[in-house]
């Protein structure tokens, strides 16, 4: 998530490449790392927590109460914002990009969230290039989510460094 970037692919085509804001690490609310599948999608949702009640136009949960959604209240995305003014774990996305993803994603779509330098079991791999330069299907092979989810679309967020290199959900 250090790159604060998300890429969204459908049928092998890159549809979205955007900066995002992920979970607030200074408050111990960092976004989850792993391979997930989209639960469902919903418009005009109200996200609720102990200290907030926030309406969003596009809600796409993939890990408990964590998901991808628009963040109309933000004027900036990317950089180090997540360290002090990040989300409660969700992937805050610019409105137009959240809309594009919403219109093209289906329940069961794999979502890959990672930090640069994450150990994936085969040594440490720093992913600093967009997913189209890697074989994402090979990375998903063998996971429970991948075997039950469709492979038409892949949402990915990258939380590596603020150099703008990745957004599969990092």
Question: Which role does the model predict for each range below?
Answer:
Residues 1-28:
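Cell wall/extracellular polymer interaction/catalysis modules
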Residues 19-25, 40-49:
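N-terminal post-signal-peptidase region of extra-cytosolic proteins
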Residues 30-35, 42-170:
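Exported/periplasmic cell-wall-interacting domains
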